[in-house]
From Swiss-Prot:
Family of this protein: Belongs to the SpoVG family.
Protein name: Putative septation protein SpoVG
Any Pfam family: SpoVG
Function: Could be involved in septation.
Highest classification ranks of the organism: Bacteria, Pseudomonadati, Spirochaetota, Spirochaetia, Spirochaetales
Species of origin: Borrelia garinii subsp. bavariensis (strain ATCC BAA-2496 / DSM 23469 / PBi)
Length: 97
């Protein structure tokens, strides 16, 4: 399965403490789109968070997620490269790719 398109929607927060940097939509093989991947700045650097929902007991469960670490790394690297391409001023972010 190939990544054929990545769309980044940067979040401009008025709250300087906001950790959410962007929402991402990834297209696979020009036939499947995965929306609402988040780019988040955490204590250990920037990472992606997969779409999730809150359960009745208040836990968050991923709706979809990579099965293997290799694919997660591929997905994250592709998203980070596109994020930096669109936002070159954010090069100082600690991106792991």
């Amino acid at each position: 399965m190939d990544i054929t398109d990545i769309r980044i929607k940067k979040v401009e927060s008025k709250n300087s403490g906001s950790k959410l940097l962007a929402y991402v939509a990834v297209t696979f093989d020009n036939c499947l789109v995965l929306h609402n991947i988040r780019v988040i700045k955490g204590q250990k650097g920037v990472f992606i968070a997969m779409p999730n929902r809150r359960t009745r007991v208040g836990e968050y469960k991923d709706i979809v997620h990579p099965i293997s670490q290799d694919f997660r790394k591929t997905l994250q690297t592709s998203i980070f490269k596109e994020y930096i391409r669109e936002n070159p001023a954010d090069l100082e972010l600690e991106l792991d790719f």
